[in-house]
Amino acid sequence: MVKGIQKISQINEIYTSIYRLIAFFLILLVFYSSIIKAESYAVASRHHIATDIGIKVLEEGGNAIDAAVAVAFALAVVNPSAGNLGGGGFMLIHLAEKTETISIDYRERAPIKSFEKMFQDDSGKIVKGLSLNSIIASGVPGTVSGLFYASEKFGTYDIKDLINPSIELARDGFTLSSFQAKNLNKHKQKFSKNKEAKKIFTRPNGFSKGDILVQKNLANTLERIAQNGKKEFYSGETAKKIANFFQNNGGILSFEDLNQYNLRILNPVCGSYRLYEICSMAPPSSGGIALIQILNILENVDLSSFDHNSEEYLKILISAMDYAYKDRAEYLGDPSFFDVPQNLLTSKKYAKKIYQLIQKEKMPAKATVNILESEETTHFSILDKWGNAVSNTYTLNTAYGSGIIPYGTGILMNNEMDDFSSKPGYPNAYGLIGSEANKIEPKKTPLSSMSPVIVFKNNKPFLITGSPGGSTIITSVLQEILNILDFQYSLKESSKKSRIHFQHLPDILFHEKFEDNLIKSLNKDRKLMNRKLGEIHSILLKKDGLEAFSDKRRPDGKASAIYK
């Protein structure tokens, strides 16, 4: 009996030791997992040099906002077609410690001397090209203001240290890729109209892969900004150079415009979709409202029950896009000038009514308004080891903006005034019809489709994403979200899936590579256009680590995820 008890006791001791050992390893596993999480960070952007600069900032202890500022300044040098000092954009920031998400509107504003009919002749006809390639095509730039605000408010680095790599890149030059060389040559005529742009961005025999692009005046401007701060761009020597150039060449952008520029801190537009929360930009971006509206409509059906990109799946997408873009045109504009019914447009109840109409195959009547912006925009996504996240989209509008560089600055200026309705009820430069909500007014912000997005799961960033692509930004980002949330694709798998785009007007179905029979079944007498759609740069947090990916629809992009 005693021996039996001793044996049981020994067995208990063995089990106790095993349990303790298991507990010990579990503690180690949890501890090790926390270390992995604490050392994880990622950057995805359009240019490999900018991504590398961002990764270095994160490696050396900077946070996501520090890296974002460094990446944005770098893209102004190595991606001159869209990265910029002379443009504007939107930045979405998630602060992990505060569990707070804020957005910065640093988009361009209309100059004080702007007026509704400024791109019309005396007879009321639109003067072709005036809103795109002329001295009056530029809005007041907001990029420098936005980057300084983000750095000063949320960053940890001295901004000089974040700008210095870009100064060196501009002064010493960087190697052009084949794509960049061809793109510069393609826009030679645009640059030829401006003395400094012609000197920097053209060659007698054109650029070739491997050529070095040097931008000394831009380096000098960046150096002054690093030394003197934001005031250098808005009231210092650089501001005077910009204002004097415009005033001396028949422009309307003035020193007063620069001096009075103010960014806006906005509450993001957020909504729930299945088990996730999606946050994006509020107006003057149309992206947040349109995305939430479409997702609300689609939430009424189990998309995962369809085969991906099947006829049934694409039909419901096209219908939801149709309604959202109709509302975008009719109801969205700068909220400082126009009463935007945001709560209505993003409500589940409103989406349910639309879905019921779609079920009855009732499509919205072809309205008389819509807006299209250029495809030349750029996006980057960043996550740091503390869980802070940045999703940023900024632009010059069309490629290289207006093609105008104020003498001595090296700064390409935007042509963002074309994003306004040059004449309500009349087609703009892209063949689309403008709305009263987006008419030109002094100090007003033009409507945009830029849609920086952060998707949350359990109150933590799950997907950080965004894209260039003009009015196709919204639908490109939408399909990235659906691919990942509904179909559980990886970022790489998602990028390989063909995309569609439909925006109510014009009545054209834009599509990538699909089978002919499928496209014909979706046609319904619409015009068809086969083209690349979007250029996604995303970061995805997975159970087993991080995935970062830059869309291969355009070369030169790079995504880096460090998961130690």
What is each model feature region?
Residues 36-52, 56, 62-229, 233-235, ...:
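Noncatalytic scaffold domains of N-terminal-nucleophile
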Residues 444, 477, 486-531:
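Extended C-terminal subregions enriched in glycine
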Residues 77-94, 98-103, 252-254, 389-457, ...:
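Active-site rim segments in enzyme catalytic domains, especially the processed small/beta chain
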Residues 84, 88-95, 378-383, 452-454, ...:
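Short beta-strand scaffold segments in enzyme catalytic cores
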Residues 22-33:
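Bacterial N-terminal signal peptides
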Residues 4-23:
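Bacterial N-terminal signal peptides that target proteins for export
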Residues 301-395, 409, 424-425:
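Internal maturation/activation junctions in enzymes
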